[in-house]
Amino acid sequence: MLRPHFPALLIGLSVLAVTNAGLSAQDRPARTGRGDGQIVLNADDVAAFPEPPAGFDARREGIERGKLEMVSYESKSVGATRKMNVYTPPGYSRDKKYPVLYLLHGIGGDETEWQRFASPNLLMDNLLADGKAVPMIIVMPNGRAQKNDRPEGNVFASAPAFATFEQDLLKDVIPAIESRYSVKTDRESQAIAGLSMGGGQALNFGLAHLDTFAWVGGFSSAPNTKPPAQLLPDPAAAKEKLKLLWLSCGNKDGLIRISQGVHGYLKEKNVPHVWNVDSHGHDATHWKNNLYYFLQRVFR
C-alpha cells in the first residue's frame, strides 16, 4: 500500500476559491492557472489536439441518454458506507458486459466533482450518438478514504486518506461495481484517469497495478508521490501492458513541471504515451477537453 507524503504546494490543485455569481468552490471551478511554480516550456510542450468542437458538452436533443446514479457501497478499508457516482450508457443491459473507466477527482472535490466540472454523462452521450466512443460505465468514486469524506475544512489535512484510497478502490470500489453491474473484469477492460490530485492517484495506482488497468490518464496531475523512475520502474513491462498512457497539462499551469518530469522520463525510456499541452491553466476547461479526447481513445 502506498504511504506517500503530500507537500501542500504540490497538492494545490483543485482547491478552487470561487465566489463568482455567488457560487462557492463546491459549485464552480476557477478558470485560472494554479500553483506558484515557474513555467518553462520545452519544444515538445504543444497541443496534441485542437480545441473540441462547439457544443461538444451541450445537452443534445433527439439522442439516447445514459443514466447517472449515486450508488452506496460498504468500504471495509474505511469501515463506513461510502458513495460513488456511476454513469451507465444508453441501452445498458445485463445481457451485455461493459468496460469500466474509474474517474478520480481533485483534492477539493468528491464523487460529484467531475459531474459539476465536466458532465461526463453529456460527453459520453454525445460521443456515443456520433459513434466516436465505446459504450462504457464510468465510475466516479470519492478519493478521500476516511469516515468523514466531505471536502470541508482544511482539505489538506485529509491528504493521507488519498493514499488509503488505493485499497478502497482495489478492494471495495471495484468489487462493488463488479457485483452490481454487468462489467468486463479483464485488465484491458479497466481504465483509470483523474484530474489534478486524482491524476496523481491515477498515475500512482494505475502504473503500480498494470495487472488491473491497461489504460491510464492524468490530466494536470498533482504530484506523483514517487520520482518517475519509481513510478514506472519497468518501462519494458509498461510498453507491453499499457494500451494507453495519457499525460496532459495546460501551458498556463504553474504545476506543469510535474507532468513534464514524467513525460521526459517516458520519452527517455521510449514508453509510448500521449503528451498534450494545451493553452489552459489548472482548470475545468483543461480537464473537460482532455476527458473528451480520452473517452474517444479508451477501450479501442
Label every PLM stretch briefly.
Residues 20-25:
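Sec/Tat signal peptide C-region and signal peptidase I cleavage site
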Residues 8-19:
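Bacterial N-terminal signal peptides
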